[in-house]
Amino acid sequence: MSLQSIKYSRGSLDILDQLLLPVQSKYVAVRGVEDGWKVINKMQVRGAPAIAIVGCLSLAVEIYPEEFESKKRLRQEVEGKLNYLVSARPTAVNMKIAADELLALANDLTKDETIDVAGMKERFLNATEAMLEKDIADNQAIGSHGAQAILKRVAEAAGAQTGTAGPVRVLTHCNTGSLATAGYGTALGVVRQLAELGKLEHVYCTETRPYNQGARLTAYELVHEKFPATLVLDSMVAALLRAKNVAGVVVGADRVAANGDTANKIGTYQIAVVAKHHGVPFYVAAPLTSIDLAIPGGDHIIIEERPDREMTHVGEHRIAAPGINCWNPAFDVTPASLITGIITERGVFKPEELKEAITKLLES
């Protein structure tokens, strides 16, 4: 059974504090939007899908007990709070897309004269709650498409049928499992599906400095699931791909541009470069909500920069020389030219096919 990072019932939201893992498993109550903003900004919850879900559910928790004098007042409240939540971690596009969708719903309901303010609030709460189930279903589809893509490529290289390929070794970066989503995971969902098919020989996870999401969170999930797994340092990836016959790299995404350029956790870009050099397929696993067709390329993606302390300290212990300057971008952008395929809940697309394919899917 996968870990549960988000616990929700109407009027109540608790999140697993990921800053305390793996030493302590503690749930933190999110009582409203201010709490939601803080747990997202402080990275007590992280992962683009989970950020969107927790952000929107924090708004649902806040408005649930409130009574509004009019639909217009409710709509104003929704708009202001959603805009505030988007500012917590601006690189992750899922929160912005979810906010836009919920605001569009609020606008439509405000104009609908057949619905009163109580009905509008109920419809809004239902829409936010539906995000949980949809995210899990989308992740399971991503896992299935991704596993089949990796196995197909391995089989083709060996001149065999897809069903006879494997077991395979894969590498992942950062944390993209149940802790980063509502459940199952994106890139780690691909790993999970390979394991369920009996096709996972081994999974390697990077430590993912400076926040150590791989060492703290992915390793925690892999041990929990009892998958055959090994933790490696970020600086070991080239040696790993040269020595260990890795069949594919699969990572998540915080934002994918229309041309396929992908913003993901810092260190992803260099892994893609190394994978290209060694001829190892490099896949990005992301729901459609992580794809931003309004951004033409990676140069237009805003990259969040984090505090120096995340580099200079581990817990309360300083590990860097006092007085040294730091540069701490949370993400980097992997060029589309280094990406083999982008795995979504609707299939796997080459970066150059992405814009046209996603546009057609959204129009259908």
From Swiss-Prot:
Lineage: Eukaryota, Metazoa, Ecdysozoa, Arthropoda, Hexapoda
Pathway: Amino-acid biosynthesis; L-methionine biosynthesis via salvage pathway; L-methionine from S-methyl-5-thio-alpha-D-ribose 1-phosphate: step 1/6
Main location: cytoplasm
Catalytic EC class: isomerase
Keyword tags: Amino-acid biosynthesis, Cytoplasm, Isomerase, Methionine biosynthesis, Nucleus
Family to which the UniProt record says this protein belongs: Belongs to the eIF-2B alpha/beta/delta subunits family. MtnA subfamily.
Intrachain disulfide bonds: none
Cross-referenced NCBIfam families: eIF-2B_rel (TIGR00524), PRK05720.1 (NF004326), salvage_mtnA (TIGR00512)
Presence of the UniProt keyword Chaperone in the record: no
EC code: 5.3.1.23
Catalytic activity: 5-(methylsulfanyl)-alpha-D-ribose 1-phosphate = 5-(methylsulfanyl)-D-ribulose 1-phosphate
Active site: D254 (proton donor)
Compartments where found: Cytoplasm; Nucleus
Name by which UniProt lists this protein: Methylthioribose-1-phosphate isomerase
Site (Transition state stabilizer) residue list: C174
Short name of one Pfam family: IF-2B
